[in-house]
Amino acid sequence: WTGTWFADIAGKTDRSVTLASGMKYLDTYLYPQESIRTPSICLLFWKGDDRMVGHNRFRRFVMAHHTPKVDGKPAHFPESSSFNYGDPSPCNEYTCLTADYAIALIRRYKQFDIVPEVFWLDAGWYSQAADYKNHKNWANTVGNWTVDREKFPDGLKPVSDEAHKVGAKFMVWFEPERVIKGSQWAEEHPEWMLDAGTDAYLFDLGNPKALEWFCDQIGELIDQNGIDYYRQDFN
C-alpha cells in the first residue's frame, strides 16, 4: 500500500490477539456509485510446535500467489546500488555526497567488475538538504526541487553520464507530493498547497493546472539530468 497505513496488534491474554488496521487519518465520504480500494490484508493462523514451519508456509504462499511473475516465473528486478557514504558523523549519503565522490564510486565498481544494473541516488541531492548546521536534512527540505549546486555543480548529468558509460542505468529519489512549509514550491504556489496539519503541505494533485505544472517540473528535472528511473517515496 503506497499511502499511510496503520496496524495495531496487541496480545491481550495468552490465548488472544487483537488487530486493528486500515488507512491512517482517513476521513472522507463517497458520492453515489463511487468507490475506493482500501489496503489489502492477509492473515495466516498457525498452530503447531514449530512456528518456523508457519513462517515458511506463509513465505511460500506469498511467493506463489502475491509475487510478480513473468511467463510464470518470479520477475527479475534490477540489481541496484546506492552511493553509500559512511562516517564520520554528520557525513552520510544525504549530507556529504558530491558528484566527484559518486563518479569515483561508479569507476570503482567498474574496476572490480561488479557494476549493478542501476545506480540509485537517494534523498538529499536538492538544495538546502545538506545544511545540517542549520538543522536542515533530507526530510525537512522537500519542496526545494533544484539540484544542490555546491555538491553537484553541473547538475546530476555528469553522474548519470558516468553510470551510462559503464553500462548501468541511473535512478533518482523523489518525494514531490510532500512540500515542507517555507520551501521553494510552497512559497511559489501557496494556492496549490493542502494543509496536512504537520510541518508539510500536500501538493494538490487533484487540481488539473497544478498537476500539469507538477509534471512539467519533474519531467524537466528527469530530462535535464539524464535520469532513467524515477523513484517515488511518500513520508
Explain the meaning of each model-derived region.
Residues 1-64:
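N-terminal accessory beta-strand-rich subdomains and adjacent acidic, glycine-rich linkers
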Residues 14, 74-77:
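Sequence-level motif detector for i,i+2 pairs with an aromatic at +2
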Residues 23, 73-74:
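Short, solvent-exposed coil/turn segments
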Residues 62-73:
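Long, charged amphipathic helices and adjacent flexible linkers at domain junctions
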Residues 76-229, 235:
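Aromatic-lined carbohydrate-binding/catalytic grooves of carbohydrate-active enzymes
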